[in-house]
Amino acid sequence: MQIEMTIKGLMVDPITNMPIVILRDKEGQRVLPIWVGIFEANAIALQIENISTPRPMTHDLLRNVIHDLKAAVQKVVVCDLQENTFYALIYLSLNGDTLAIDARPSDAIALALRTRAPIFVEDTVIDHAKTVDFTSEKNDADRLHKWLESLDPDDLGKYKM
């Protein structure tokens, strides 16, 4: 089952210093942190903060190409988690057909923000992510788990990229 999510915030992992996109379901019951690259986090942050750039960035270009081809982004879905790597699909409608295009979640999310498309996560991905150790060191995993558990949901919107 797909669960609609919203971006609750962007944070920096205190252990790896990598950006994390925090997705949360509309009821506030489920949260999914997704580690992303710095450039992708910047693309997401620019859109969240409504900051325009003088020239189109990569995700703006992709949005423009999709629009000019008379296609539309229906939704993006974080659909799988394999070997500590999240996978996503971008669903495009084009000439009455629906295409599912493989993408990194960070790119799919950045595009969804630019096209106002909904973001979904398969419930199995959320369930599986709870059991996966995303860090290589046990101590780091414990520290990260405690840090994520201690987060106040109100703090998530305070961290800007």
Model-derived regions, located:
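Divalent-cation
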Residues: 1-161
